[in-house]
Amino acid sequence: MRPTKLSVALGREALAARTESANGWLQGTPPGRTVRRVIDGLIDIELADRSMSLAAKIFTSVLPLIIAASIFSNWDLATHAIEEQLGIDSTDLSAWASEYDATDPTFAAFGVLGLLLVAISGTSFTRTLARIYAKIWNVPPISARDAWRWLVVLLLVAASAALIGVIRQVSGPHFVGRSLAILGELAVWAVVWTVCPYLLTRGALSGRVLWATGMLTASGLTVIRAAGRIVLPKLTATAETKFGPLGVVFTSISWLFALSMVIVGAATITKALALDESYLGRYLRGPSAGA
């Protein structure tokens, strides 16, 4: 046998041995089985496809609601937070908004009706999120009889953006202020993403699983947003220079895609941890499930 062929054969044998060893660890040890469940869960939920679908719904449902609400309320803090994240210059938007008087009766009546329609159409985001949770946790999807849950979750997610804007404004620019802002943001996300799966699964999950999902989601979102504040403004400026407004759209959707991957991935990982054979899994399942 030639040396080249011998090297290839030895390489294949080594790869097969490593693969067999990895499979043995994944199937033969509790941590390995948990990792295997995480991988299988992410594949089964189709992480990339679900995240892109959720990101598109956020872009077309949640952001319009925040922008529309900012015209009639103090939710401009939410839009400023988004602008700061992406590095968008809001001068043109502010000039456009200043041309309209929200106190005018005709404009106010049309605006309230439009805001209501935006909120109703915005439930497409929460319907998509509900289907994702239903598939992950194997629970029945929400029917039209529980449609109020869709609207409550939508308003909760939108309001959290405004609340985070308030926290960032109050905290100030100093190091201590930034630390408080991060902790406040983490707390807001933890509450929001504990309540959201509770509502969208109709209370089918235990409190421990809900809090674990909320904390894991909040941690991921906080890290992504912190990193985004560093890299996104430059990326947005570059994309806008090269592609114009479409560049801002592409960058925004990419950012929302990363956030959506955290939302979907955190729920999937929490389920895998809840099925773990260790103390953590037994704790998340609770006394009744472990009996």
Q: Each predicted region: which residue ranges?
A:
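Membrane-embedded alpha-helices and immediately adjacent juxtamembrane helical segments
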Residues: 1-291
